[in-house]
């Protein structure tokens, strides 16, 4: 069976040499040390990883007809990804993200402009419905429009497909959407936003996981930056 991702944007990464918090003050300018551009996004990165690990991956996204959309296509070609479920917007640009990386603290800040991938339509979802039904996993994230996420998740749940949600970039989601998800993968900030529990210890992570379980999530994975990863499968 297939694994399916809904994804895409292009990432611009700027390393800074700022030694204190990477958060910039109003009007502040800092000197960067390196800049690079490449295809990325939560779904794209996860899909490529699964593909390289031998998975049968179907990528679904919407691109603009622009130079950045071409970057995404070339990146897919470079790793041999299938392009059967790509859609195009004639009037909205390809999604992008600007990532500021503090090279000393190994922390980053990200501004996401979803662009075309936030315009997936009912017609687009109808075109991939059979592919979702025949998948083993559906991997979603919050860069695409939430109505597309919810419709895709309903199709998956109805057909016994396990749904994994990467909760970035954070936006509020309904308890109905969370109910029945196989796995959620927030970071500490997103976990707090979604549960009201500040994840500053393993005990607090237990508390956040308990809230997710009450909402019907089966498994919880919280990324903790330099401290590693918290995993709890008690809801399964």
Task: List the predicted regions and their residue ranges.
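Glycine-rich phosphate/adenosyl-contacting loop at the front of the ribokinase-like
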Residues: 1-62, 67-78
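Short gly/ser/thr-rich secondary-structure transition/capping motifs
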Residues: 80, 118-123, 163-169
């Amino acid at each position: 069976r297939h694994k399916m991702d809904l994804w895409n944007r292009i990432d611009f990464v700027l390393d800074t040499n700022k030694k204190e918090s990477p958060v910039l003050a109003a009007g502040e300018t800092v000197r960067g040390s390196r800049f690079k551009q490449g295809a990325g996004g939560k779904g794209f990165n996860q899909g490529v990883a699964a593909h390289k690990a031998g998975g049968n991956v179907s990528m679904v996204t919407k691109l603009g007809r622009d130079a950045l959309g071409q970057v995404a296509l070339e990146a897919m070609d470079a790793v041999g990804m299938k392009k059967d479920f790509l859609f195009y917007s004639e009037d909205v640009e390809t999604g992008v993200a600007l990532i500021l990386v503090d090279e000393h603290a190994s922390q980053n800040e990200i501004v996401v402009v979803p662009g075309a991938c936030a315009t997936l339509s009912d017609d687009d979802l109808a075109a991939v419905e059979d592919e979702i039904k025949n998948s083993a996993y559906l991997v979603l994230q919050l860069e695409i429009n939430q109505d597309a996420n919810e419709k895709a998740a309903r199709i998956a749940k109805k057909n016994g497909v396990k749904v994994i949600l990467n909760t970035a970039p954070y936006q509020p989601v309904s308890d109905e959407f969370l109910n029945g998800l196989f796995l959620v993968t927030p970071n500490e900030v997103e976990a707090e936003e979604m549960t009201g529990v500040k994840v500053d210890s393993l005990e607090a992570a237990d508390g956040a996981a308990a809230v997710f379980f009450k909402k019907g999530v089966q498994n919880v994975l919280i990324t903790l930056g330099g401290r590693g990863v918290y995993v709890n499968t008690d809801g399964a």
